[in-house]
Amino acid sequence: MKNSLIKIRKSLVKSDAFDEYVKEARSFDIDRMHSLQQRMRIAMTLTVLFGLMTIALALAVAALTPLKTVEPFVIRVDNSTGIIETVSALKETPNNYDEAITRYFAGKYVRAREGFQLSEAEYNFRLISLLSSPEEQNRFAKWYSGNNPESPQNIYHNMTAKVTIKSISFLSKDLIQVRYYKTIRELNGKENISHWVSILNFSYINAHISTEDRLINPLGFQVSEYRSDPEVIK
């Protein structure tokens, strides 16, 4: 009987130990599962965070792309003078179109004023008058007069002077520089080339002129001061 009780007691002790073991094992599994779930939540949070950061970075780069563009340009070196200038394309903006129009009139003005061909002399005189302020008209008329020994009429006489524009650039909003070379051709075919720089003060005015004159100067381009000097050759 006593032995039976001892066996039962040992059996109960083993049962209690086993239950305790199972309880501890189950608790360990639960803790490990909780830890795994917590790590998964942290990983998912970090994944979402990095994803949002990537999207934000992509949007920032896309927004900055128009602000940083690479514009190719060409540099041209004048073989005669060694002067370097940048050759650029016309951009589709109002300011650049305004500049293009001004360059057109400035080039036209210099070609007419510095060039000479007897058959075009009368038209060019009229063109310069229409594109000049009253003060500059007077200065030009005195310079062009036959009484002036330096007048193109007296210098070139039976020769021709052709102006070729090399570059036109803005020094300020109302001051423009025109670089050109002049080819003087004599009757015997001999040519003499010289390089020049002209500076023009200009503006646009709303003058009352005839329809015929408006066809020559439709926008009221007007030169108020003009000078032309030989370009220094390096």
UniProtKB/Swiss-Prot annotation:
One of its GO terms (biological process) is protein secretion by the type IV secretion system. Gene3D superfamilies: VirB8 protein. The lineage of its organism: Bacteria, Pseudomonadati, Pseudomonadota, Alphaproteobacteria, Hyphomicrobiales. It holds the Pfam family VirB8. CDD domains: VirB8 (cd16424). The chain crosses the membrane at residues 42-62. Belongs to the virB8 family. Component of the type IV secretion system VirB/VirD4 which could be a major virulence determinant for subversion of human endothelial cell (HEC) function. Residues 1-41 are cytoplasmic. Keywords: Cell inner membrane, Cell membrane, Membrane, Transmembrane, Transmembrane helix, Transport, Virulence. This is Type IV secretion system protein virB8.
